[in-house]
């Protein structure tokens, strides 16, 4: 049984649906944990995974995600959670009000501790910031992020459509394919 350590119910639901497609059952370890403040999403995810080894039985995984807005030099980036909880989507839109370059990307880094090592999986999706909040599905920045090739925000998509293209789904597909490959190799 693989454990997903997160306090975010929405994340767990998204990831559970993806895991089921691979025939992988995951357990939710609902837990808040302290993250280091760092400019690297990869380091934040790795450090969290490493620290949790003292209290969570392997195998388990964590993820860290960020929204990186090009015109704002990557802000909010690895500080996305804090920015979301303080100024929210309205604040981001206000900062972006007179900005023409609305290109951005979402990045997710999944770190899995197998007991002997930590392996990372990265997912990235390019897109742009909408001019208004749109949609009611998803969470976080979903109502203001329009993925490349779409005219809808993530929040305007159902979970299946979002999971087909999102940064989180790319990273977690990498994880689940890795798990399946290792399960096959052990047989």
UniProtKB/Swiss-Prot annotation:
| Cofactor entry | Mg(2+)
Q: Which residues bind substrate?
A: 6-11, 65, 139-142, 162, 167-168
Family matches, as Pfam families: Ham1p_like
Q: Which residues form a coiled coil?
A: none
Protein name in the entry: dITP/XTP pyrophosphatase
Similarity comment text for this entry: Belongs to the HAM1 NTPase family.
> How does this chain assemble?
Homodimer.
Q: Does the keyword Transmembrane helix apply?
A: no
Q: Which UniProt keywords apply?
A: Hydrolase, Magnesium, Metal-binding, Nucleotide metabolism, Nucleotide-binding
Output the Gene3D superfamilies linked to this UniProt entry: 3.90.950.10
This chain's source organism reads: Thermoplasma acidophilum (strain ATCC 25905 / DSM 1728 / JCM 9062 / NBRC 15155 / AMRC-C165)
Q: What does this protein do?
A: Pyrophosphatase that catalyzes the hydrolysis of nucleoside triphosphates to their monophosphate derivatives, with a high preference for the non-canonical purine nucleotides XTP (xanthosine triphosphate), dITP (deoxyinosine triphosphate) and ITP. Seems to function as a house-cleaning enzyme that removes non-canonical purine nucleotides from the nucleotide pool, thus preventing their incorporation into DNA/RNA and avoiding chromosomal lesions.
The catalysed reaction is: XTP + H2O = XMP + diphosphate + H(+); dITP + H2O = dIMP + diphosphate + H(+); ITP + H2O = IMP + diphosphate + H(+)
According to its record, what are the GO cellular component terms?
cytoplasm
Where Mg(2+) binds, per the record, is at 35, 64
Please list the GO biological process terms of this entry: nucleotide metabolic process; purine nucleoside triphosphate catabolic process
């Amino acid at each position: 049984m693989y454990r997903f350590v997160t306090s975010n119910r929405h994340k767990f639901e998204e990831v559970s649906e993806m895991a089921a497609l691979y025939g992988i059952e995951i357990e939710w370890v609902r837990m808040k944990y302290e993250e280091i403040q760092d400019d690297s999403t990869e380091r934040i995810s790795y450090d969290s995974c490493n620290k949790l080894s003292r209290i969570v039985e392997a195998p388990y995984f964590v993820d860290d995600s960020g929204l990186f807005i090009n015109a704002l030099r990557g802000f909010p980036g690895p500080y996305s959670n804090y920015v979301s909880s303080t100024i929210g989507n309205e604040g981001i839109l206000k900062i972006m009000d007179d900005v023409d370059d609305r290109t951005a990307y979402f990045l997710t880094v999944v770190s899995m501790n197998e007991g002997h090592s930590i392996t990372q999986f990265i997912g990235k999706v390019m897109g742009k910031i909408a001019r208004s909040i749109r949609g009611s599905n998803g969470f976080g920045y979903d109502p203001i992020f329009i993925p490349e090739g779409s005219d809808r925000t993530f929040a305007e998509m159902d979970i299946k459509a979002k999971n087909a293209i999102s940064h989180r789904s790319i990273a977690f597909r990498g994880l689940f394919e890795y798990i399946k490959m290792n399960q096959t190799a052990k047989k």
